[in-house]
Amino acid sequence: MRILHLVLAPRLSGAEVLAKDLAIHQQRSGETVGIASLVPQHDDFASLRVELEANSVTCLFPTKLHGPLGKLWHLDRMVRRFRPDVVFAHATIPAFYARALPIAAPVVYVMHSAANDFERGLFRRVERMLSRRARAVIAVSPANVDDYVGAIGNHPLMMVIPNGVDMARFGDAAHVERGPRQTQPTIVQIGRYTTVKNQLQTVHAFHDVAKWIPAARLLLYGVVEDSAYYQAVTELVNRLGLADRVVVGGPRSDVSSLLFDANVYAMPSRSEGHSIAFLEALASGIPVVASAIRPFAFAADFASVQLIDTDDTQAYTQALVAALSQSRAQRPLAGLTLKDTADRYMAVAHRVIQAATT
């Protein structure tokens, strides 16, 4: 089977990382797999591209930024070149472009968004026109289904497939050659700099954590999606006198090492789809403090996981302090591994290809 994954931009973010992991898994399983994008590769994706190419996954990324017609032209060329049997379009904008072209292969729209894309009138109108051009719609969480049905209506083939994590990459066994962990109490948050990820609240809470645990430090890493928000985080760190204890950094590809070395993972998101970052933290065993939102509820009873109202600074502070004294834990992630997710995607691929030929 020839499988093409389409993303908006090759970057270190959830949808793109899942597409990369699926592509490599499927290629290793004997399929012929490519990954295409609508805009050029971000610098932070370089190491992931090396990994893709080392596993013989074809990368079809434009070398310059195009307007809407240019994006359609580029995508048409890439589809003709790759000749896919099925296209998985990851996120709403790539799914728009894939369905706007007369692509013979069935298109599967994968809803990754943490927010409701269809609150925007334009997106709602376009999706209503293109909805049936998708042979299937995959939602990564039940909230995505609710958003779609509420704004667009029912789709003939719609299902929830949770994201999955590569367990082998995040367990302690992956770091046996690293030696012992560093000993400084460390809290880490990894995610795009945007209001929905709520890094500002983590900085406020950490200001109080540092009063209880003077040796503690905070590491923030992620794609700078909102430069004004990133600047606000940096300014708050400086204003609170935390510059020597807080790192406000860009995206990192060595997430498993960061989780191995840190003591607590913070995730005060206001909304999520089905977060890859949250799954990676759970797989690593690190104590987790996260917001009590619906997509995280499945982990509420897991060891060393606290789901709280992270907008309550005092409660958030107390949870972080408590987590710094907790032990790492093994969590039951059956059904949430990369293999589980890849198997479900392959089942969808077989189903839509069969339907297209009958």
Where are these regions (language model features)?
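Short hydrophobic beta-strand element within catalytic cores of glycosyltransferases
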Residues: P287-A290, A297
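Aromatic "clamp/platform" in nucleotide-sugar-dependent glycosyltransferases that forms part
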Residues: P251, R270
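Conserved acidic donor-binding segment of nucleotide-sugar-dependent glycosyltransferases
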Residues: F302-Q314, A322-Q326
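A conserved mid-protein helix/loop that constitutes part of the nucleotide-sugar donor-binding site
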Residues: S13-I24, P185, R192-K211, L218, ...
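Glycosyltransferase donor-sugar binding loop
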Residues: A36-D43, I190, R217-Q231
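N-terminal strand-loop element at the rim of the active site
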Residues: H5-L69, M158-V160, Y229
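A short, active-site helix/loop in glycosyltransferases that binds the activated sugar's phosphate group
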Residues: A134-M159, V165-R169
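Short His-centered aromatic/hydrophobic patch
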Residues: A89-A95, M111
